[in-house]
Amino acid sequence: MDISRTEQRILHLMAQGGRIEIIRDDNRKIENVSCFTRDGWLYPGVDLDLFRRLKRLKAIKSSGGQPYRITERGLRLVRSQLDNR
C-alpha cells in the first residue's frame, strides 16, 4: 500500500521514537494533535486529517491513555530512510 509523502515523513519520525499527543475538549472530541520527536521537539507537520488517516491505516495506536506510537503495521508501511544524524 502506498502512503503519501507526509504520512511517510511522520511514520519515519515515529519509528525513530517520536509520539503523537492529543488534546480533547469537554465532550471528549479530539481538539488538537501535536507530534513530538524523540528529543522532545514539536514537529509542525501533523494536523487532525493526517492523524485520522494514520489511525485509519492502523499505523499508529494508543494504549492505556498513553501518547500514540507507531505499530508493527506502521513499521511495515514506512520505507527505510537514512537517519541523517
From Swiss-Prot:
Transmembrane segments: none annotated. Signal peptide: none annotated. InterPro entries: YjhX_toxin. HAMAP family: UPF0386 (MF_00827). Belongs to the UPF0386 family. This is UPF0386 protein RHE_CH01859. It comes from Rhizobium etli (strain ATCC 51251 / DSM 11541 / JCM 21823 / NBRC 15573 / CFN 42). The lineage of its organism: Bacteria, Pseudomonadati, Pseudomonadota, Alphaproteobacteria, Hyphomicrobiales.
